[in-house]
Amino acid sequence: YFQPKELPQFELLDLENREIETAAFNGISLLNVWASWCITCLVEHPFLTQLSKNEIKLIGLNYKDSQKNAMEWLGKRGNPYAFSIYDPRGDLAFDLGVTGAPETFLIFNQQIIGHIQGELNQEKWQSIFMPLIQAAKETS
């Protein structure tokens, strides 16, 4: 069982140099920790692309990467993210308790209500995140 917790307060730029802060996480969103050097991120990318076509807001957290490599990676493979927060030193990732990439956080109104380490796939989506999303929708 996952104990919900507050999303850490932050102010960072995204990969396109726009300012992003905690307030960007309203409603239901997924925060996916990824990097251009991460092999498993490549594996989960098609599923994230499919997910991004749903009404779920998918936000990237580019982790310990170079902006240039990250932009090239998305340029080649497609960008499923509404925006991707640039976290070159891993500061926000550290505050979130990230141990590596990929990791995905389910966030509802700035509360982290779910978390998985490793690849997000259809099975984990259905068994872990969907019940939490349904519960969040029922309480709002």
Q: For the regions a protein language model found, what residue spans apply to each?
A:
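Hydrophobic beta-strand anchors of alpha/beta hydrolase catalytic cores
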Residues: 30-31, 58, 104
